[in-house]
Amino acid sequence: MSMLAELVEVVIGVDTHSQTHTAAVVDTRTGGVLARATVTADPDGYAELVALAEQHSGLRAWAMEGTGGYGAGLTRHLAEAEELVVELDRPKRPARRAGAKSDPIDAERAARDALAR
């Protein structure tokens, strides 16, 4: 079985909430964060995230938890656009405490967790 990093050039980790979604675009080769964005959790925001992803060439995957909850609308939008979405388990509490809690950090963590699979 191939690891995600062998299949795509970037992973977009998304931290989903009821009003906003925060994303981090991570380069699979270098591990560097190429871009970050926070958008509204609505169709306009989803389109902004796809536009952000399209600024980075190559194959991509999206990683998020809550695809059936706060991330459901974004997940549907991405599925309609034929984007690859990886659903993550909620991080264990100690992992969440290992550093400051912030949406940008959680978005980056989502991308890195997907790459570790």
Report residues per predicted region.
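Phosphate- and other anionic-substrate recognition elements at nucleic-acid/protein interfaces
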Residues: 1-117
